């Protein structure tokens, strides 16, 4: 069975992070429509020849064959478009952040349930190579009880042109929404969250630097982003009572896509970095292992959605995980940073 889908938006998100994976899954997905406000020259590319481009959203929403609508627009329009698609009887996938507010997310989930549909965020970075490798190390049990995880998503981009905006336009919403989701997918809802959210490069802009510390009993997960890191820093550091894991290097899918190397082509997402796992085994002997990176694949979002829509499989991101993530994001701006909040059980 092939599912017909449609996209709202035809910017970088759609063309770089979605279409290369969907178009590589012709046995399960067919892109029927793309809604955009104005025509673009890129539409003429042969790879898009089968897609109907339109500036009339009703053409998309009124097509009974479309079973999934993917919202890839600016964050402040996510809620409106997702709600319209659900009201039209479509399942919905929404780019990050899912919605600007927690209340809007709850409304979308309630609407989807009332119509027997699914609505979910595009948490493609659950399928980053670096995260999957760290996850494998954690789940191996070789580290024993995990006491600390540190996740970095850093750049060296010291100059920032003036672009004032809202909190959802900053790094905490833009990148933290992914890196915190990774932590939540592993450990669930934290007890407390400590925040340090700042704008360092241009004070007129939303935040570009943050550190969030998620506390789970004796476990602390640290999620950090900076645009002022010149020397490569580990992507993941994990400490347990029996050992440690460290992984340099970020997933290479985006690098390949920028170089016009597509999924399925030779060399796509090639990554020669390794993770290092060092632990004390049951015999008291220190063991050092190199872990080859797991294969990243953002298309697994669509594989999971296919199973949800066709077979009723549980959504790959739980509703509770989405709401926890958005609550953490939202509460980070309730008071001046640094700050600490306690989450309700």
From Swiss-Prot:
GO annotation, cellular component aspect: cytosol
Keywords attached to this entry: Oxidoreductase
GO BP field: antibiotic biosynthetic process
Entries under Gene3D superfamilies matching the protein: Dihydrodipicolinate Reductase, domain 2, NAD(P)-binding Rossmann-like Domain
Family annotation (Pfam families): GFO_IDH_MocA, GFO_IDH_MocA_C
UniProt keyword DNA-binding, yes or no: no
Domain of life where this protein originates: Bacteria
InterPro entries assigned to the protein according to its UniProt record, in alphabetical order: Gfo/Idh/MocA-like_OxRdtase_C (IPR004104), Gfo/Idh/MocA-like_OxRdtase_N (IPR000683), Gfo/Idh/MocA_oxidoreduct (IPR051317), NAD(P)-bd_dom_sf (IPR036291)
EC number: 1.-.-.-
An MF annotation (GO) of this entry: nucleotide binding
Family: Belongs to the Gfo/Idh/MocA family. Biliverdin reductase subfamily.
NCBIfam families, sorted: PRK10206.1 (NF007574)
Name by which UniProt lists this protein: Uncharacterized oxidoreductase YhhX
Organism, as annotated: Escherichia coli (strain K12)
Gene coding for it: yhhX
């Amino acid at each position: 069975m092939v599912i017909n889908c449609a996209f709202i938006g035809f910017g970088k998100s759609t063309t770089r992070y979605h279409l290369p994976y969907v178009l590589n899954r012709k046995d399960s997905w067919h892109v029927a429509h793309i809604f955009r406000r104005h025509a673009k020259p890129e539409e003429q590319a042969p790879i898009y020849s089968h897609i109907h481009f339109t500036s009339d959203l009703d053409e998309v929403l009124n097509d009974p064959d479309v079973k999934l609508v993917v919202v890839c627009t600016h964050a402040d329009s996510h809620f409106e478009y997702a709600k319209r698609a659900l009201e039209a009887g479509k399942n919905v996938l929404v780019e990050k952040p899912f919605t600007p507010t927690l209340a809007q997310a709850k409304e979308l989930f309630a609407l989807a349930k009332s119509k027997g549909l699914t609505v979910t965020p595009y948490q493609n970075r659950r399928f980053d190579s670096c995260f999957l490798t760290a996850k494998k190390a954690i789940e191996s049990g070789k580290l024993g009880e995990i006491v600390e995880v540190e996740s970095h998503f850093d750049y060296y981009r010291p100059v920032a042109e003036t672009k004032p905006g809202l909190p959802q336009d900053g790094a905490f919403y833009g990148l933290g929404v992914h890196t915190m989701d990774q932590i939540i997918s592993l450990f669930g809802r934290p007890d407390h969250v400590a925040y340090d959210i700042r704008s360092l490069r241009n004070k007129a802009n939303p935040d570009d630097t943050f550190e969030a510390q998620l506390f789970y009993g004796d476990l602390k997960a640290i999620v950090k982003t900076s645009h002022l890191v010149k020397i490569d820093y580990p992507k993941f550091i994990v400490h347990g009572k029996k050992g440690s894991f460290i992984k340099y290097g970020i997933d290479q899918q985006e690098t390949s896509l920028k170089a016009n190397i597509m999924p399925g082509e030779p060399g796509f997402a090639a990554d020669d970095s390794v993770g290092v796992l060092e632990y004390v085994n049951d015999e008291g002997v220190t063991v050092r292992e190199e872990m080859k990176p797991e294969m990243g694949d953002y298309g697994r979002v669509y594989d999971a959605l296919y199973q949800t829509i066709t077979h009723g499989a549980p959504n790959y991101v739980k509703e509770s995980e989405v709401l926890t993530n958005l609550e953490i994001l939202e509460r980070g701006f309730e008071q001046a940073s640094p700050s600490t909040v306690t989450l309700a059980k």
